[in-house]
């Protein structure tokens, strides 16, 4: 059973990281579009929001893949995702927006699992903790 747990934890981290990496890289490719989208939501400082989103998504995605500071990274990504859901998918009269909102909330739930239980044994965190003992 331990082999299955190990594989599931690593797979879950990789799948979650892929979501953030793809989103962050996509933002790099279309700065004007993303800044316009941020501005259209009525948020201040679209350029700053754009840069923060890239740092959080790409940086957080990479850190999730390698399993470094996973609990902290998961909490940051969870807060970021919750904020994005509230800012961008809050038009519940539109069924599509409601679906996006609840998908984001489900992602937050998955990230909270990483925050609570850590990255699993195939991670830099596990290696670092094993070396410390």
Protein language model features and the residues they cover:
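Extended, low-polarity transmembrane helix blocks
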Residues: 1-29, 39, 47-55, 59, ...
